[in-house]
């Protein structure tokens, strides 16, 4: 989930070449801020600057940012400013789409970025920190993005005593050593998505304090809807057995594995009305050309392409759907499926579980937190490989399923309707326990400690 981040960058970041760029850079002369930031003095409140994806986006990062901010806005002793990046002017949002709490100050990082690059506003952040003088700067993203912000902050040699916290999105079992060194050198505190990811960091030598900040489920937004009515509106046969994948068509999501598994499944059961719905592009944005791949897989199996060609459905648009639209897709399907070779949380599958739809997912990463044999089909990822930075800027150890194993996992719900129904009910029951209030509690606790320390020093 990282819209418009280049994932095929052949250039190794400067901060990965040498830690000198982090710890020994000369100060950068920064022009005065043009941002509409809060005053440096906020009536004795603790000041937090959250650096993350703007809430007016269609990515998982934006959803999580919104969930966190809404909880933090309830704290009367906390002043919150959001340095929200990658809100692109060409994107249109409906009125009322993720309205920010009135007491959260918002800085549009993409708008401030001159000249415009990728909309992150890396070089503008030091200016904002100098103007706002926050007690805590908290950066949320994967380490390739976090690292670029840290480099710019370090170059600026900022005055003041702000602390740097990192909400670290991990998708693979290993982080590159340069990123680990950066966290140990620069971060005062780290937050991981799950206990599993926390232990993963600790096992790689992280010495900084690590807390767990999970994700929450928006039960007022994602809720069960009548499936038959949805299918009628979408012109999908009521008797169809529909699998759904809402992930973007990008390398980590391994749509090639999904298409191979699906082709095997439809050929194995030619008389069953099996369909796959993918809410992504067809391949024109640099991912897999899904229809070409599917056609080839059918030909390799010696079947008539016309017989099964219409079983793969790909949305005509992607990255434009409102949360309410996504809820409709979730409810349209019988089963959700994920074929990724690394997953930090698995937000799409998590949300679909929340409306009562069971999932077929790899037994990796964030899925281990909320998926079990009682609410999902967990497929073992038997293939392991290491990613070069030319392929992924975060590198790491990927774990992928064999397409045949994924096919067998998808087959379980196709052939056992009672298991599918039972798992769907259990999935919803599980996910409903993940509230944002519960998720943000560890962060609130740490912020409260900082507020008490600040008051004691006053």
Where are these regions (language model features)?
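C-terminal alpha-helical cap of glycosyltransferases
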Residues: 15-22, 436-458
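Conserved donor-binding/catalytic core segment of Leloir-type glycosyltransferases
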Residues: 49-50, 237-253, 259-262, 276-278
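Carbohydrate-associated surface elements
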Residues: 196, 216
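A short helix/loop element that forms part of the nucleotide-sugar donor recognition site in Leloir-type
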Residues: 222-236
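Nucleotide-activated donor-binding/catalytic signature segment of Leloir-type glycosyltransferases, i.e.
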Residues: 288-328
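Aromatic "clamp/platform" in nucleotide-sugar-dependent glycosyltransferases that forms part
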Residues: 341
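A charged, aromatic-enriched C-terminal amphipathic alpha-helix characteristic of glycosyltransferases
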Residues: 401, 405-406, 415-445
